[in-house]
């Protein structure tokens, strides 16, 4: 950056030493964070990879297990089901939430200052509450006998269902809940990006006779693309880590109907204490997220 | 003009409908927490629970019942019917007591107060630490040139992509071997090492003019003094945003705390709420009272610092 790094790297060792000594204060400033980072992030990350190739015994040493943990991960029915459930959950909720956030933000943007502030708060407020709270209240709302949800869908002629207790509805109950939680971050980011789109673009389109919808499709949506890419990546990553709702609302059940990857990691590691296997599962999760992020980034960035 | 206002009405009503859906669960937390849980009719024959009611009661029934008894008590007093008046007065105080009984049981039969305090102090300790350490690191990474700067920065940033679940197992072993299991250190230390703030602070510090820092140096200020009295005050908006997000993350953090905490008096609020639910699966008045207590502080923080939330989100997001 700005050529300074190039000159540092091209210097001889002596120059580096001199520069390090001269800048000792910079290293002192970095010391607390760097120490914490190394101990509680860098080492555990490397260790997780090592553990995934080991058979971990609580007493006694660790034995190398080669790829056997990974083989058990991919052979296990539970993991396959967890991967499938997590994928369905992500594939439905992420596009839905990003698109509704875009529409909501576009509608809000057309309003005056006061109304903008009100709706922005109304949509962001539920997201500051912990998922623990949201999951607890939705478990109550999905109650078969007294739940609000069955009551409300009754207005539209639907029969009451034991949403969380049946294996054919439990995953959908979790999905519907996620769809009805507003994507507050998305709405706020979209609103911020919309206000930076130049007015002259819209003026030019108006002169060309474009209507509101055409302007939205041809100007607003393409101009918001960087935000869309970011939001899709952000919510996909978050979605693949879904856990709190699962442990508080279904415990992964009935059967494996709502098992997700992180809930399975939790069970494997901290209920069954199979550390090697849990580490392998989490490494697999990491690569899944990495690959999906790269693919999404490329796909969404393709035409630019 | 007319067409315009119809369009606007449509937009506003659509958004209002959407916000009702979005706010309904939070409303339901508060409504259930204050719902009458057992209520006797005037003939004393039937005890009703308005919590478990089908169809559900849409607001705390104590409110209309209270005023009904109040009216009847007034009437009885007017007619000098002392027995009736006392009965209705007693019912009024019973209704108040029952309405808030969920909260009372949380504090008397469970350690809600302790959980609240634990969450609060851990949140504050972590937030202060993160603000200090991350702004120090962000400052030198943005403004100083020294060997290894880029390597350190990219090393830190590259781990932001790694899902935190990857480190669960090694961290568990480490915390156990360090003897920190079932202590608050097991929460505080890992939370202090989160790297997002370094990235945010570095972005923010870039916008501080170099001239100011140079001027302080020429005036003979030490590195620490320059950071403390020139850089930090200029970074206040960034610090506010980072502080709020750190506090919110710690306050809501769940997966790691349920793994490392075992003693009820050490629980944070989310962990306490989970054990509360495990022990009282169908007592929704109690559960919603707990949820309400956990939700209130974040709602207040949000309403006061709304501006900083927006700022933090847009800072952390796309800046292209």
Where are the regions that the model predicts?
Chain A
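A structural signal for multi-pass alpha-helical bundles of membrane permease subunits
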Residues: 22-304
């Amino acid at each position: 950056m700005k050529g300074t790094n190039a000159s540092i790297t091209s210097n001889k060792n002596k120059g580096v030493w001199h520069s390090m000594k001269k800048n000792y204060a910079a290293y002192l400033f970095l010391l607390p964070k760097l120490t914490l980072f190394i101990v509680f992030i860098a080492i555990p990350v490397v260790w997780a990879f090592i553990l995934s190739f080991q058979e971990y015994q609580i007493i006694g040493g660790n034995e190398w297990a080669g790829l056997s943990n990974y083989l058990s991960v991919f052979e296990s029915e539970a993991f396959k089901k967890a991967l499938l459930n997590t994928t369905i959950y992500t594939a439905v909720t992420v596009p839905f939430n990003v698109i509704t956030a875009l529409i909501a933000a576009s509608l809000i943007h057309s309003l005056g200052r006061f109304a903008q502030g009100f709706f922005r708060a109304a949509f962001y407020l539920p997201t500051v509450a912990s998922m623990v709270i949201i999951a607890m209240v939705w478990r109550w709302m999905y109650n078969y006998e007294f739940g609000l949800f069955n009551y409300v869908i009754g207005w539209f002629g639907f029969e009451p269902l034991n949403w969380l207790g049946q294996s054919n509805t439990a995953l959908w109950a979790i999905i519907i809940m996620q769809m009805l939680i507003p994507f507050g971050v998305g709405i706020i980011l979209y609103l911020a990006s919309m206000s930076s789109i130049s007015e002259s673009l819209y003026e030019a389109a108006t002169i060309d006779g474009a209507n509101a919808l055409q302007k939205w499709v041809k100007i607003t949506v393409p101009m918001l693309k960087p935000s869309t890419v970011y939001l899709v990546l952000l919510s996909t990553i978050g979605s693949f880590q879904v856990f709190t709702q699962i442990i508080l609302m279904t415990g992964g059940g009935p059967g494996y109907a709502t098992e997700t990857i992180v809930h399975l990691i939790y069970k494997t590691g901290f209920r069954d204490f199979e550390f090697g296997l849990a580490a392998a599962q989490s490494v697999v999760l990491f690569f899944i997220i990495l690959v999906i992020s790269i693919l999404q980034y490329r796909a969404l960035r393709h035409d630019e | 003009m007319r067409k315009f206002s119809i369009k606007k009405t449509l937009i506003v009503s659509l958004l209002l409908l959407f916000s009702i859906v979005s706010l309904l669960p939070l409303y339901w937390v508060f409504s259930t927490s204050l719902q009458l849980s057992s209520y006797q009719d005037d003939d004393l024959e039937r005890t009703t629970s308005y919590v478990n009611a089908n169809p559900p009661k849409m607001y705390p029934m104590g409110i209309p019942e209270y005023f009904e008894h109040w009216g009847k008590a007034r009437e009885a007093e007017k007619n000098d019917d002392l027995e009736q008046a006392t009965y209705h007065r007693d019912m009024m105080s019973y209704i108040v007591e029952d309405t808030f009984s969920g909260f009372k049981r949380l504090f008397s039969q469970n350690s809600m107060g302790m959980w609240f305090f634990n969450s609060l102090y851990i949140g504050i300790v972590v937030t202060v630490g993160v603000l200090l350490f991350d702004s120090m690191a962000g400052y030198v990474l943005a403004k100083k040139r020294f060997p290894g700067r880029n390597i350190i920065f990219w090393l830190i940033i590259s781990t932001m992509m790694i899902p935190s679940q990857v480190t669960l197992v090694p961290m568990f072993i480490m915390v156990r071997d360090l003897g920190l299991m079932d202590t608050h250190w097991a929460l505080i230390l890992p939370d202090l090492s989160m790297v997002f703030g370094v990235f945010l602070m570095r972005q923010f510090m870039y916008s501080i003019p170099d001239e100011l820092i140079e001027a302080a140096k020429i005036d003979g200020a030490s590195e620490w003094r320059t950071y403390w009295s020139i850089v930090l005050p200029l970074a206040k908006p960034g610090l506010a945003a980072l502080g709020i997000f750190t506090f919110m993350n710690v306050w809501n953090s769940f997966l790691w705390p349920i793994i490392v905490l075992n003693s009820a008096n050490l629980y944070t609020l989310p962990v306490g709420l989970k054990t509360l639910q495990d022990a009282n699966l169908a007592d929704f008045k109690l559960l919603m009272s707990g949820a309400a207590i956990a939700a209130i502080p974040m709602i207040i923080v949000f309403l006061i610092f709304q501006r900083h939330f927006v700022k933090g989100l847009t800072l952390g997001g796309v800046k292209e």
